């Protein structure tokens, strides 16, 4: 365990290179299980979630080679149902549910522990299991385990998700690429990370159309090839550092970004008073305003405002000049950071799914506790703007989704340091 000490009150100024997207890296890493050939993945962020997923794949028999920093080569030519993914790691990662489909397709049977992850609401797996069953899998839940088998090759289906789900969309896509026949998926999640997975699978030989839309069509192939693929930049990391500039009235240049992926965040930041200029094809400069204007924000599936930026924007709105209303429509329990922000002087009232944020002139430093990945970084952001020193505890959450955050902030003159508890 470790903490981050943040001394606030300094405008951030500098340049940050955005890392590869965690939420694209994880499913693409899992996709290596779909082929016996080598998949080389570039722009892989160095995160604990990535390390844990690679460890899970190693336990399944995948050969993992670190080619160089940010590049890995995965070869799944020796996987076996006799390998057992480690329960302690599977249980703490909700993304581990994705190994079910490829292992089932390759081996015909699989048994894994129920997945975990951040303690945010009811991140259920029922949509994943419904998709697997529709493709022909037999599923049994045994206390803390999922057992699945498929007596023959999975078959193509027409399937409409009951609700938009990033994770279940990924599971269904992985089933469909090797299923026998044609699959039509409706009401799919449209996140860029799902499109990135599809483009990687297409490079491996998958037949996929409708990428990036709510309706995806896939014609199954008998086998996939290897490929060399680069992961898209992390739009959530980029949005986080944009808030860092805005909340400190600073000026930061961000490199390796995709503008269209940031459209909703950029729109809200401009409404708050920030000045954002595009520099070239993949760089932008954001300059924070002296007076931050309040916002109304509703989280919804892409291309709308992302739930993964809700906590960061709440920190920003806590010092806005007026009242903001933030509505969390994705998860029912994603306001755990609110109680920590209140310790720092924020004026926030929760009413069901709404957070009513009345801006204060200044936050003050305090000892606060991170409860999940995005909450942890929102508290660091609040600390950057606060008077005095903020200590954010349980920073292992941060390591799951932010590569070198302390170093990147220090490069922008932030007074932050990591210390052991």
UniProtKB/Swiss-Prot annotation:
**Gene3D superfamilies with a match to the protein in the record:** Enolpyruvate transferase domain
Q: Which residues carry this modification: 2-(S-cysteinyl)pyruvic acid O-phosphothioketal?
A: 118
Report the catalytic activity.
Answer: phosphoenolpyruvate + UDP-N-acetyl-alpha-D-glucosamine = UDP-N-acetyl-3-O-(1-carboxyvinyl)-alpha-D-glucosamine + phosphate
Residues bound to phosphoenolpyruvate: 22-23
Question: This protein's superkingdom?
Answer: Bacteria
Amino acids binding UDP-N-acetyl-alpha-D-glucosamine: 94, 163-166, 308, 330
Q: Could you tell me what this protein does?
A: Cell wall formation. Adds enolpyruvyl to UDP-N-acetylglucosamine.
**GO terms, molecular function:** UDP-N-acetylglucosamine 1-carboxyvinyltransferase activity
Protein's recorded name? UDP-N-acetylglucosamine 1-carboxyvinyltransferase
Cross-referenced PANTHER family, in alphabetical order? UDP-N-ACETYLGLUCOSAMINE 1-CARBOXYVINYLTRANSFERASE
Q: Keyword Cell cycle, does the record have it?
A: yes
Task: Give its E.C. classification number.
Answer: 2.5.1.7
Catalytic residues (UniProt): 118 (proton donor)
Its family remark reads: Belongs to the EPSP synthase family. MurA subfamily.
One GO process term, biological-process aspect: cell division
């Amino acid at each position: 365990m470790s903490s981050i000490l943040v001394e606030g009150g300094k405008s951030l100024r500098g340049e940050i290179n955005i890392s590869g997207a965690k939420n694209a890296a994880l499913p693409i890493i899992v996709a290596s299980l779909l082929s016996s050939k080598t998949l080389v993945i570039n722009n892989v962020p160095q995160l604990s979630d990535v390390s844990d997923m690679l460890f899970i794949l190693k336990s399944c028999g995948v050969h993992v080679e670190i080619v160089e920093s940010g590049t890995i080569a995965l070869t799944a030519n020796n996987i076996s149902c006799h390998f057992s993914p480690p329960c302690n790691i599977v249980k703490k990662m909700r993304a581990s549910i994705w190994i079910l489909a490829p292992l089932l397709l390759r081996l015909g049977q699989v048994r894994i522990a129920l997945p975990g992850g951040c303690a945010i609401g009811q991140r259920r797996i029922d949509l994943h299991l419904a998709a697997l069953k529709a493709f022909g899998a037999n599923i049994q839940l045994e206390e803390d385990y999922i057992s699945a088998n498929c007596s023959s090759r999975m078959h193509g289906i027409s399937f409409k998700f009951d609700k938009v789900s990033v994770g279940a969309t990924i599971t269904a896509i992985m089933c469909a690429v090797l299923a026998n026949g044609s699959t039509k998926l409706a009401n799919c999640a449209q996140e860029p990370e799902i499109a990135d997975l599809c483009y990687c699978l297409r490079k491996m030989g998958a037949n996929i159309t409708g990428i990036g839309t709510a309706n995806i069509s896939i014609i199954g192939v008998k086998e996939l090839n290897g490929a060399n693929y680069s992961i898209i930049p992390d739009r959530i990391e980029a949005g986080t550092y944009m808030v860092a500039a805005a909340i400190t009235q600073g000026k930061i240049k961000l490199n390796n970004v995709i503008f269209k992926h940031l459209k909703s965040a950029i729109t809200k930041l401009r409404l708050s008073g920030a000045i954002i200029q595009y520099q070239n094809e993949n760089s932008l400069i954001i300059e924070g305003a002296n007076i931050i204007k309040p916002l109304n924000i509703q989280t919804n599936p892409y291309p709308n405002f992302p739930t993964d930026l809700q906590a960061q924007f709440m920190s920003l709105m806590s010092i806005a000049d007026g009242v903001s209303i933030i509505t969390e429509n994705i998860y029912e329990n994603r306001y755990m950071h609110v109680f920590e922000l209140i310790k720092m002087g924020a004026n926030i009232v929760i009413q069901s799914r709404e957070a009513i944020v009345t801006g204060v002139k200044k936050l003050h430093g305090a000892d606060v506790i991170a409860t999940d990945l995005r909450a942890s970084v929102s508290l660091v952001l609040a600390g950057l703007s606060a008077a005095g020193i903020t200590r954010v505890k349980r920073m292992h959450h941060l390591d799951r989704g932010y590569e070198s955050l302390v170093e990147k902030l220090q490069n922008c003159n932030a007074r932050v340091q990591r210390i052991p508890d």
